[in-house]
Regions:
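Mg2+/Mn2+-dependent nuclease catalytic core
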Residues: 64-158
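A contiguous, basic/glycine-rich beta-loop/short-helix subdomain that forms a polymer-engagement track
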Residues: 326-351, 362-369, 461-577, 586-589, ...
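Metal-dependent nuclease catalytic cores that hydrolyze phosphodiester bonds in DNA/RNA
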Residues: 1-87
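Walker A/P-loop
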Residues: 211-233
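Signature of the SF2 helicase/ATPase Hel1-core->accessory helical subdomain module
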Residues: 230, 257, 261, 333-350, ...
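A substrate-engagement module of RecA-like helicase motors
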Residues: 183, 189, 242-351, 359, ...
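Conserved RecA-like P-loop NTPase helicase motor core
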Residues: 574-586, 639-752
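Conserved pre-motif I regulatory segment
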Residues: 176-219
Length: 790
């Protein structure tokens, strides 16, 4: 082999799953949790291997190198077993399944193909004329085993394997040629703008972090240009082969657009860099209902027969894989746009997507994040303050007692064994319910886990035969809940609290609550080379470092604001409070008067954020009465509890329109309008934040408080103060978005004056002034007069 030639590596499993797939997408059976990725699956593998005797060699690493046109293809894998007897050498491939073995009439084509690849590699290494393949299927619940044996002539097997490799060669060649062109283009790009204050330091910090394969936490205020300052050094690093692929991860759709624009800006310098933006299945699906099977969806029928051609053509023609481009290609080739997009993501240089495609155990891109060791991935994690709560959600799971009874009622007539399994779980939940008053923390639920595994097996069997569409959908939804619960249960550790509680609607739930998501997030981060967490509100940074990664030597940088603080007025109203003991009509009237006087001081657009809908409605009522008794004209818009996309757009559109009177938007702190919206210049000149943002007391928050207290940390801060302050910082950040913006930020709660509140203020809030209701209007008038003078 020519050592100077570039090398393309691929696993045997990925090779056969990609080249040899065929047929339809069909989600009508659960398919089971992947037993290969579960601890139970691994245990069964080891148990079978131990039982096989002295002529059985377990976990045999295999690899072969093939000289291709201009590159070397290295194919690697690990056979579950290799059996050497006097009569024959045989490769053993073990697969755990949930369904009954009498339903396994023959090995799955992909499973057998994987074993045949291993067999061909062994036959070539050992110079064999003939070799056997044994497919071992083990039923996960009963541990019953069923085997299929085959014998192959080595020359025939090699011809088959060579054909698989030949089909893959064009894909490997594309990788080599594109990488060469891409890296050459990266050498020529420069930072596309004059550096703002702190921006060069930020970009250098990102590059050094990638170079050293570390993690970096960035606290950088609005206006620094975080997106281009992270994307540019990451692209440069890819060009220097410090990483293979950039994952730009976001919590909201709007920030994906900003990332797309950053890559597009670099393309103006002739950068060659293929980037895909992934859209949720429900949004990109062509059908009215997302029903992924060949009977309901024409794009699912024969999808795997056509998708590789669709992907290859797209790679040859496009560098920007936007939603519109993906939809057009999917329609042209009559394939599922979502599944095609996931395939395209394998081949591109950058993936812009939601957090869940990397971190969520139910949604992550398995092709990157489940098999094998680390890839050369660079994670750029935007608005990273969101990842704590999102992480808790992704790694937690719950089951409701009432759902077991509902499914039992549906199936008991035709599936008594299934109903019996459901009832066994229901009895355990009933016993838990009798011991629970409000909520109850549990030490051990292993007895429930065993019964739940039985339910999963029976659900899988039931779905194979169920023909009633409505019943199937209900049972399938239940199946996914159980599967998700078991996957989380399989990884329970000291970062979890298991508890039961009654929900507000009276339903009784058992919850696996991930109180600290750091360890789970770290497992995903370990699949990459480096990660950069950035946000305008990553304060206090030690809190986020502790909850987003388990590593102790992560870097952190604090970038100073580039904005002129003279262009904004920051005040704290110290004569009001949202404490429960202080809430009264008189206090609501006081808040209403604050709003009125601030807006009266300067006509324009304002957002007012409240701690809850109830509080907002009470103050809104007082404000409308105040407005009715005055000649001042103001237009009001108010956030509703459940707003569809059109209603959200209408709310924001009101701020885009010119008018001859003030506009006041009433919203909820931590809601859809207090984060991620960009209202520049005159579109927003003031924000009033009512309350400290503390989450409402609930079981979950109290569990967090107790957990972190026991860890020797300040539980109240972790459960309440830090999440609350983040909401305040985000809401305040809506006002000054560009260096030309001017505006007022008013924090309305006396508790901001306490040391605990002030110590987590950002540096640029050092000029926060105290104010009272009787002087607020005068202070604001003076501020705006100074702006006019300037």
């Amino acid at each position: 082999m020519d050592e100077n030639l570039p090398v393309i590596r691929i696993s045997v499993r990925n090779l056969v799953e990609f080249i040899l797939r065929e047929g339809d997408i069909d989600n009508r059976t659960g398919g089971g949790p992947d037993p290969e990725n579960m601890q139970m699956g691994s245990r069964i593998h080891r148990k079978i291997q131990r039982q096989m005797g002295s002529d059985y060699q377990a976990e045999v690493p295999l690899k072969t190198e093939i000289a291709c046109d201009g590159f070397t293809l290295k194919i690697e894998g690990r056979a579950d077993g290799l059996i050497h007897t006097k009569e024959q050498v045989m490769v053993d491939e073990i697969k755990g399944v949930l369904r009954e073995l009498d339903r396994v009439q023959e090995p799955a084509g992909i499973h057998l193909a994987q074993a045949k690849c291993y067999a061909s590699m062994v036959a070539e290494q050992e110079g064999l004329d003939e070799i056997g393949v044994q497919m071992t299927y083990c039923q996960m619940e009963t541990e019953e085993v069923k085997r299929f044996q085959y014998s192959y002539q080595s020359n025939e097997l090699k011809a088959w394997f060579d054909e698989v490799i030949r089909q893959y060669e064009k894909w490997a060649k594309f990788q080599i040629e594109w990488r060469k062109a891409r890296n050459a283009s990266i050498k020529g790009i420069e930072f596309p703008f004059p550096y703002r204050k702190g921006q060069r330091d930020l970009a250098v910090s990102v590059y050094r972090t990638i170079l050293r394969k570390k993690k970096l936490f960035i606290q950088a205020p609005t206006g620094v240009g975080k997106t281009i300052s992270t994307v540019f050094p990451a692209v440069k690093a890819v060009g220097e082969e410090l990483g293979e692929k950039i994952f730009y991860l976001t919590a909201k759709t709007i920030t994906r657009t900003v990332a797309e624009q950053a890559f597009e800006t670099l393309r103006e310098q002739n950068l060659k860099f293929k980037v895909i933006t992934l859209t949720a299945k429900e949004k990109i699906c062509f059908c009215e209902e997302t029903s992924c099977n060949p009977d309901d969806c024409p794009y699912a029928k024969g999808h795997f027969d056509r998708v590789n051609d669709a992907v290859y053509e797209l790679l040859m023609q496009e560098d920007v894989m936007s939603r519109e481009v993906l939809e057009a290609q999917a329609r042209k080739h009559k394939v599922c746009p979502f599944e095609m997009a996931l395939d395209v993501s394998t081949w591109v240089d950058g993936v812009i997507c939601d957090y869940n495609y990397v971190f969520d155990p139910d949604a992550r891109l398995r092709r990157f994040f489940t098999e094998g060791g680390a890839g050369g991935y660079l994670f750029l994690i935007d608005e990273a303050h969101n990842l704590v709560e999102r992480g808790r959600q992704m790694y937690s799971a719950e089951l409701c007692k009432e759902d077991f009874l509902a499914v039992k009622k549906l199936v008991k007539g035709e599936a008594p064994r299934f109903a019996k399994r459901l009832e066994a779980c229901n009895k355990i939940l009933l016993a838990m319910k009798k011991e629970c008053e409000n909520y109850k923390v549990l030490d051990n639920i292993s007895h429930f886990g065993i019964q739940l595994m039985n339910v999963l097996s029976e659900t899988d069997r039931y779905l194979e035969e169920c023909v009633d569409k409505e019943v199937r959908e209900t049972v399938l939804d239940f199946y996914f809940q159980v599967r998700s619960f078991l996957n989380i249960y399989d990884g329970l550790d000291e970062n979890y609290v298991v508890y039961t509680e009654y929900q507000e609607n009276g339903r009784f739930v058992l919850k696996l609550f991930c109180v600290n998501p750091a360890a789970n997030l770290q497992k995903c981060l370990d699949k990459g080379n480096s990660a950069v967490f950035f946000s305008a509100t990553l304060l206090p940074i030690q809190y986020y470092k502790r909850l987003l990664s388990t590593e102790k030597d992560n870097y952190a940088v604090y970038i100073d604001s580039s904005f002129d603080t003279k262009k904004r007025l920051l005040m704290n109203g110290v004569d009001v409070s949202t404490r429960y003991t202080m809430r009264s009509r008189e206090m609501y009237q006081r808040y209403a008067t604050y709003i009125f006087r601030v807006v009266k001081a300067k006509m324009g657009n304002y957002l007012i954020f409240f701690p809850s809908y109830r509080f907002m409605e009470d103050v809104y009522q007082e404000f409308t009465q105040l407005l009715a008794s005055d000649e001042e004209e103001m237009e009001l818009v108010i956030q509703q509890k459940h707003m569809d996309e059109e209603e959200r757009e209408n709310f924001l559109r009101a701020f885009e329109m010119g008018r001859e009177k003030s506009l006041i938007g009433f919203g909820v702190l931590g809601g859809i309008f207090s984060e991620g919206i960009d209202l520049t210049n005159e579109k927003l000149i003031g924000t009033l934040i009512i309350g400290t943002g503390l989450p409402q007391v609930c079981n979950e928050r109290e569990i967090l408080k107790s957990y972190f207290d026991q860890k020797g940390l300040y539980g109240f801060d972790y459960a309440y103060r830090y999440p609350g302050m983040n909401k305040v910082l985000q809401a305040a950040g809506r006002v000054i978005r560009t260096e030309d913006d001017r505006g007022v930020i008013l924090l309305l709660d006396e508790r901001f004056q306490k040391e605990k509140g002030k110590e987590i203020f950002p540096k640029e809030w050092a000029d926060c002034e105290r104010c009272r209701l009787d002087i607020v209007e005068e202070k604001i008038r003076l501020f705006w007069e100074k702006q006019t003078d300037n």
